[in-house]
Amino acid sequence: MERIHELDSLTFSDMLRQGSVSLSKDKNAINDLNVFPIPDGDTGDNMLMTLKAGCATMKDHLGTLSEMAQAASSGMLLGARGNSGVILSRIFAGLAKGLQGLIIADTNAFAKAMDAAVTEAYKAVPVPVEGTIITVLREGAAGADASGDLNHYLETLLEAMQVSLDHTPELLQVLKDAGVVDSGGAGLLSIFRGMNDALNGNITAEEIESTVTLSTPTVELNKFDENSTLEFGYCTEFLLRLMRSKVDVDTFDETEIFDYLNRVGDSVVAFREGTIVKVHVHTFKPGEILNYCQQFGEFLTLKIENMTLQHHQTVNQNNASFKVPPKKYGVVTVASGEGLVNAFHEIGADEVIAGGQTMNPSTQDFIEAFGRINAQHILVFPNNKNIKMAADQAAELYKNADIHVLPSTTIGEGYYGIGSIDRDNPDAEEVIASVTEIMQSVVTGMVSTAIRDAEGDQVSVHTGDYVGYSGKQLLSDSPNRKEAASALVKRLDAASRDVMLVFFGEGVPQDEAEQLVAELTETYKNLEIMLNNGTQPVYDYIFVLC
């Protein structure tokens, strides 16, 4: 086997792609490293989709090691899903920073880049918790030996990561109680195992498919003929590489482009990542925008769609009138299930991103949702702790409105929070403070199917049973779904509340839900109960008490 002393761009690309292959094989086992007996955010899936987004950005990209690392980082930044995916994207952002300006990297240079990855990963977490992915990264980098070739460095890195991963239950009691190691750390170890395989020449032929590439839409050409009128303009998207032959890349102020786009277009989403400017804009004259932007660089990708032609195939918000004054507040939230989505729209949400407990939206999903809202302030309700980091990352990248990510961790908090927004109050901070206070008074309980045995507060949970819980508290368990639901409502102290919303899920017959509500109404005579068909996955019932 050839020993590698210097890392070039092609080898780095192979390493990341093989890391994706390795993680793809291990993702189900990683998903099963779940400390909670309810289907969770699927760490393996989130990390894999994030890594694939980076691999997709690198595809067919020829450049230096530095440029390749930056391309991967940019793709992961936008494709990041779930907390584990966001942290992974920041790890590779740090690695890219450490490799910045390098055509090749020897062992010492790569080791320093790994140290930069550690620093960036810890910055991504407001309150770092040891015993997680960041610990495995830090202790792995600290234990790796950079005195030899890259093969030796990766081998010792993997050894140190494995030791660290095995030790995570000693750092987090919740892992020890569940008898598992940290899932994010396991995912990271799998990625670096694949990277090590590639470095040693063990590259599989498995195709790495992108999870972020958009499919080509079906176009009904008869919807726009020779007698039609262009009502909605063109949806124009492109990636522009700033070129040193045209501008001083290091000092160029991208707001020159952003200000121009806001003058001539609508629904602008534009941001810069390194030397790449990503643009989404609605305009009647895409040619003028392309000509203007080309004076600063060259296009990497380009897509123009006739929105009048797409009128019958796209959502209503893409057809909004141009050049209308922005409203004060816009709202973005996250939910799954047609009934829940409709409920959020009815209560005042402008955009409901498809997602939730086991389907975490990406940073890109949030950015695109922001771009479809014409508002000064956009309030974001993630409704899940595992979604908030992607929302926060999107908020940092988006520059065309003030984005406020609120601390909603449940469907109930998001629902009541959105419904309480005082849209006539000009003071955004007052509005946010009021909404946050109201959300804190909301209690949300869910019923789902247990995927493992567990011990909770006064309840033993058995695999396959229906389990009622609130936050991370296990409150009821029964083989009978209705019994588990009734016991949960009692544990939530429904008798002390005034109103309870009940959303029943996609697998629950309506007559069962109606019977449950009838029984609860008889038991809690002073409680106003409202039943809704949420059609949500994962949760058989969602109870929201206020």
Kindly give the residue locations of the regions a language model identified.
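N-terminal loops that bind phosphate or other acidic moieties
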Residues: 1-546
